[in-house]
Regions:
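Short glycine- and acidic-rich boundary segments immediately preceding or forming the N-terminal edge
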Residues: 1-18, 29
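Conserved DEDDh/DEDDy metal-dependent 3′-5′ exonuclease domain
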Residues: 18-28, 32-42, 46-182
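Intrinsically disordered, low-complexity sequence elements enriched in Ser/Thr/Gly/Pro
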Residues: 3-5, 168, 186
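Acidic catalytic cores of enzymes that act on phosphate-bearing nucleotides/polynucleotides
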Residues: 183-199
Length: 199
């Protein structure tokens, strides 16, 4: 099945395409896209709810309108992917956990700026700082939370899990732009940068 492009009907009228990266050709395509991309929206799914020794089970990335789901359990050599990714500015939501998991399990350390949308929301005094709540507030789109308690270590992953995973990064760039603009208007961007550097 390899490089699988799936078109999903999400909560907006547009149709999204994502690539499920489980073989070398799909991974090479992703590397080329990352090299040419600007900031990369990043998230991970782990098996912390189902296993004592947690591990990264899925890595989600959005590069503009392109969305990739990388399967770390597929036996691929991800060292080149992680090296290229480390050179890109990253956008995450509640990224402390994701970066810690990637660091401890894969040795990944970002070398460029990180923008955390949850920290931005906190600095702006927004009460509901969960990703779904922020997307609802800023874009009037409901993305659902049905995948939060999934066992991400089990294969195959379901269509519902994959759709949930795509939504974790799909809106991050637009959300970061909105929150970043408000941080700048309130002269709080440096506070945010300092908090992100501490992750």
């Amino acid at each position: 099945m390899g490089d699988e492009r799936k078109r999903e009907s999400l909560t907006t009228e547009e149709t999204e395409t994502y690539v499920y990266v489980r073989d070398v050709p799909a991974l090479e395509e992703l590397l080329e896209c990352i090299r040419e991309a600007g900031p990369v929206a990043l998230d991970t799914e782990a098996d912390s709810l189902h296993n004592y020794f947690e591990k990264v089970c899925l890595i989600q990335l959005s590069l503009g309108s392109e969305h990739y789901l990388v399967d770390p359990l597929a036996g691929l050599d991800l060292s080149g992917f992680l090296e290229v990714l480390a050179e890109k500015p990253l956008i995450l939501h509640g990224g402390d956990y994701d970066l810690r998991m990637l660091r401890t399990s894969m040795g990944f350390r970002p070398r460029r700026d990180v923008f955390d949308t949850m920290i931005a929301a906190q600095l702006l005094g927004i009460e509901q700082i969960g990703l779904a709540a922020l997307i609802e507030q800023f874009f009037a789109i409901s993305i659902g939370k049905e995948g939060q308690k999934s066992d991400w270590s089990r294969r195959p992953l379901s269509e519902r899990q994959l759709r949930y995973a795509v939504n974790d990064t799909r809106f991050l760039k637009s959300l970061a732009e909105r929150l970043g603009g408000e941080l700048s208007r309130r002269a709080r961007l440096e506070w945010h940068s300092e908090s992100c550097r501490a992750m």
